[in-house]
Amino acid sequence: MSVQTRPDLKTVLISTGLVLTLAMGVRHGFGFWMQPISQAHGWTRETYSMAMALQNLMWGLFGPFAGMAVDRFGTARIVVFGALMYAAGLVWMAIVDNAALFVTGSGILIGLALSCTAFGAVSSIIGRTAPMEKRSWAFGISSAASSLGQFVMMPVEQRLISHTSWQTAFYVLAALQLLIMLPMALRLREPAAEHAHGEHQSIGNAIREAFSHKPFLCLMTGYFVCGFQVIFIGVHMPAYLKDKGILDPDVAVTALALIGLFNIFGSFYAGKLGGTIQKRYLLCTIYFSRAIVVGLFLLAPLSTWSVYLFAAGMGLLWLSTVPLTNGIIASIFGVKHLSMLSGFVFFSHQVGSFLGAWLGGYLYTRFGNYNAVWGIILLLSLFATLVNLPVSEKPVQRLQTA
């Protein structure tokens, strides 16, 4: 692992930002393949939903281990490995026509790839490179980069599917993973390990400390809700709109792109405000606002413009939880094991994602609509608002007495 005292923050943010832009941008567009793949192979929506659900679950399951690997071997090596797995997973999705192999193979490969290229993998180098007073802002920048990917890549993915074929679209995206991610990974240089401020701690002690700390468990619970909500909307929104009579695919593309566009601002300002306002209050505001936005969307007459307004509102709240959650973890436990601890919290997020993706398909297959899932989303928003209220950013005793 190449180490220097303090790498340039701008270089780190640009490099990790491009990695996140591509990793998250491609992943957010997987919903566009639901109907063409299901029709081509004669599958139900539940089959493709299970593949997406397993991807998210594996992403979360591998997350803590990817975090440990980052802390041990450095961000660059792990991102390179993740880029290779991402390309392999996309090719797998293009060539496999057996349902069981498609679900398990794509779930494991893409899930592993995302654990090595998304927030958990890059949070450590960002947290250790940015000065403490800029840390929340830096996390906001990285979260905004992932939203930029959603805004940029989703129209690209839809047009690749429309103007070539869904298989060719996978091949093109696999090539992009290698052409863009690999050079960016090689630009990442680790800051020297900082052992001041009570940061001498083994992995086992760090895990025990975190799981015995109530705010950490509250963050995990709230993040479960976040995962359930965003994945259900990202995976099932295109199909939901078609079911409701909005047949133009460009409406779904535009809506999901608007979510990405508005979350650039939402994530950036969430990170910026997190430096001056208690992050738990911002998290509570985000979750409660989601209930309001979803409720208004369901009550209003459905039209193209109501879809766009919903997308803009959800976009402001979409990944705004990420810089705040990572910032709280860094404030409480320090940055030595930040990638690993963020990975554990993110695992909870991905359990929610698994249920959001799979349950959407399961309940649709059983009842022919998504009404029950929208109701669950409303209730979970209120639950997450209450769960985040007691979360304190006060450092653990180990850091206070150092």
Give the label of every model feature segment:
Residues 142-190:
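Helix-loop-helix hairpin linking two adjacent transmembrane segments in secondary transporters
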Residues 62-75, 266-278, 364-365:
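Helix-to-loop junctions at the C-terminal end of transmembrane segments
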Residues 257-262, 276-328:
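C-terminal transmembrane helical hairpin of 12-TM major facilitator-type secondary transporters
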Residues 61-100:
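Conserved MFS/SLC helix-loop-helix module at the cytosolic interface between two early adjacent transmembrane helices
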Residues 21, 101-117, 224, 306-320:
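Hydrophobic core of transmembrane alpha-helices in multi-pass small-molecule transporters
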Residues 106-144, 334:
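Cytoplasmic helix-loop-helix junction between adjacent transmembrane helices
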Residues 30-34, 214-268:
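Extracytoplasmic gate region of multi-pass secondary transporters
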Residues 186-205, 397-401:
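Flexible cytoplasmic inter-helical loops of multi-pass small-molecule transporters
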